[in-house]
């Protein structure tokens, strides 16, 4: 049986410690692919980028961690991964691990 393909993203950015911890944990059970925002994108909800071009760059860190950093939102990352980057749809999509509380639904504008 083949290992599941796991797409990992977050809202804290590809350099956040939580995404690396999640990548390490998911490496035990599947083949994780990290595609996350290049910079912190907290509190953007389901936003997507409509007017600016999305840029994707390869990121390599110590310990074998590698992924793609996208100049957009977490939703952009998932969408571009599934529609343009991956050869096949992932078996699982995970977002996290968050640096702080997930309070998006508690914010009143």
Region spans (language model):
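A cross-family phosphate/adenosyl-ligand binding-site feature
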Residues: 2-6, 20-85, 89
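Short beta-strand segments
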Residues: 9, 35-37, 95-98
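Conserved short-loop catalytic and cofactor-binding motifs
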Residues: 10, 66, 104
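Short glycine-rich anion-binding loops that position phosphate/pyrophosphate groups of nucleotides
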Residues: 12, 40, 73, 98-101
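Short acidic, Gly/Ser-rich segments with clustered Asp/Glu that frequently serve as metal-coordination loops
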Residues: 12-20
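Short, Asp-centered acidic motifs that coordinate Mg2+ and/or phosphate
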Residues: 92
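Glycine/threonine-rich flexible loop motifs
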Residues: 101-109
């Amino acid at each position: 049986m083949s290992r599941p393909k796991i797409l990992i993203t977050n809202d804290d950015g590809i350099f956040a410690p939580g995404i690396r911890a999640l990548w390490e944990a998911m490496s035990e059970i599947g083949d994780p692919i990290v595609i996350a925002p290049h910079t912190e994108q907290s509190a953007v909800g389901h936003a997507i980028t409509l007017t600016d071009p999305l840029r994707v760059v390869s990121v390599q860190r110590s310990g074998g961690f590698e992924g793609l950093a996208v100049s957009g939102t977490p939703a952009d990352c998932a969408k571009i991964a599934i529609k343009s980057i991956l050869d096949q749809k992932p078996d699982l999509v995970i977002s996290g691990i968050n640096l702080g509380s997930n309070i998006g639904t508690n914010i009143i504008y």
